[in-house]
From Swiss-Prot:
The keyword Transmembrane applies. Its main location: membrane. It is found in: Membrane. The chain crosses the membrane at residues 2-22. GO terms for cellular component: membrane. It comes from the Bacteria. Signal peptide: none annotated. It comes from Bacillus subtilis (strain 168). The lineage of its organism: Bacteria, Bacillati, Bacillota, Bacilli, Bacillales. May mediate a negative feedback loop that down-regulates the expression of the sigma-W regulon following the activation of sigma-W in response to conditions of cell envelope stress. Might interact with and inhibit the activity of the protease PrsW, or could bind to the anti-sigma-W factor RsiW and thereby protect it from PrsW-mediated cleavage. Induction: Expressed under the control of the sigma-W factor. This is Sigma-w pathway protein YsdB.
């Protein structure tokens, strides 16, 4: 009887370990940080939730986008997206093409929206366009 209970406990412990590993590997925040460290593109977004901001990383810079809806009548229609970064000093290496790529990726998800950039990003875009 004791051996049977011990086997059940070990089986439950093994199942919990597998669950914890899968949950860790599938964590989107961990995947975002990994993509940021490898300077890849990755986006975390809940398209059905208009109140939740999205995060994206591109070339090692983490951006955040705030979705704006025009009125409460259309809760699923995104009108404007305001994008900013906490580290504008990393934008020195960005070209105008990089900002266009980010806009394309966002517009793939929200085709009828206008993208507003934060002031440091606007300045970096204008400096690159000159």
């Amino acid at each position: 009887m004791f051996v049977m209970v011990l086997r059940i406990i070990l089986l439950a412990l093994f199942a919990y370990c597998i669950y914890a590993v899968v949950k860790y590997v599938a964590n989107p925040k961990r995947r975002l940080k990994l993509a940021q460290s490898k300077e890849h593109f990755y986006i975390i977004d809940e398209q059905n939730n208009t109140r939740k901001n999205f995060q994206l990383t591109y070339k090692g810079v983490l951006f955040e986008g705030e979705k704006h809806i025009p009125s409460k009548d259309h809760p699923l229609f995104i009108h404007t997206i305001f994008v900013w970064t906490e580290s504008p000093e990393k934008l020195k290496h960005f070209s105008a093409k990089d900002f266009e790529n980010i806009e394309e990726k966002v517009l793939e998800r929200y085709p009828n929206c206008k993208i507003d950039w934060d002031q440091p990003i606007k300045l970096a875009k204008k400096a690159e366009e000159r």
